[in-house]
């Protein structure tokens, strides 16, 4: 019991000593309380849209500089080339007999109009008639056409089938008949023109040329 009392006394002394030491210090006052500012209310975060991905820039090619236009001169229309046709060499004729000159008659006879004067059984020169009908004579303009060239070859083949002594008379009669059918005119003018064309046709086919009229050089007509 006495020990308990001693312990309580010691505790009381220790407590009093501790309170005296605490209250009787340097006499400093405690610092005033610190006033903190009120809290700042931040705005809510702004949700930005996602970034837009733009396409890469298109690089245009540099402009093309065209050359200035070239002024082309108008085409020059050249005249058609002259007609060249092969001439066949004349065949040797077995002593041709002289034939009467058709231009000695101022007016054509009926046999000359029919193209059968002195021919007898000579075949009709149908291709030569077509040759003259298409105005394919050597003095006409469309003489160089392919149709005229074909008719010319066929006409020359038919002329070679005629006997030499009757060949010129046959072609003269055909030419004279064709002239009078196309352009009616006087018999003397038609006869001279037919003689000229007949000579050109025989030369064109490479055949023997007829003998000229004895009065043609003097320019007269026998009576």
Curated annotation (Swiss-Prot):
Any one Pfam family match given in the protein's UniProt record, by short name: Gliadin
Region (2 X 8 AA tandem repeats of Q-P-H-P-C-P-C-Q) location: 97-112
Signal peptide: 1-19
A single Gene Ontology CC term: aleurone grain membrane
Cell compartments where the protein resides: Vacuole, Aleurone grain membrane
Main subcellular localisation: membrane
Keyword Cell cycle: no
Family listed: Belongs to the gliadin/glutenin family.
Protein name: Glutelin-2
Organism of this sequence: Zea mays
């Amino acid at each position: 019991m006495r020990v308990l009392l001693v312990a309580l006394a010691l505790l009381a002394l220790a407590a009093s000593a501790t309170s005296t030491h605490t209250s009787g210090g340097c006499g400093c006052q405690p610092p005033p309380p610190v006033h903190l500012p009120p809290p700042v209310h931040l705005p809510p975060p702004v949700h930005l849209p996602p970034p837009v991905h733009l396409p890469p820039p298109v690089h245009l090619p540099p402009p093309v500089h065209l050359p200035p236009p070239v002024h082309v001169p108008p085409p020059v229309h050249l005249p058609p080339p002259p007609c060249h046709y092969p001439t066949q060499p004349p065949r040797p004729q077995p002593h041709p007999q002289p034939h009467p000159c058709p231009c000695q008659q101022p007016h054509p006879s009926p046999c000359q109009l029919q193209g059968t004067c002195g021919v007898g059984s000579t075949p009709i020169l149908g291709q030569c008639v077509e040759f003259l009908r298409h105005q394919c004579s050597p003095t006409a303009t469309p003489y160089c056409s392919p149709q005229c060239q074909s008719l010319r070859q066929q006409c020359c083949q038919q002329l070679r089938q005629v006997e030499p002594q009757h060949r010129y008379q046959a072609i003269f009669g055909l030419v004279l008949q064709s002239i009078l059918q196309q352009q009616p005119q006087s018999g003397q003018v038609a006869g001279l023109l037919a003689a000229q064309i007949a000579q050109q046709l025989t030369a064109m086919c490479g055949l023997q040329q007829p003998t000229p009229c004895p009065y043609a050089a003097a320019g007269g007509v026998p009576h």
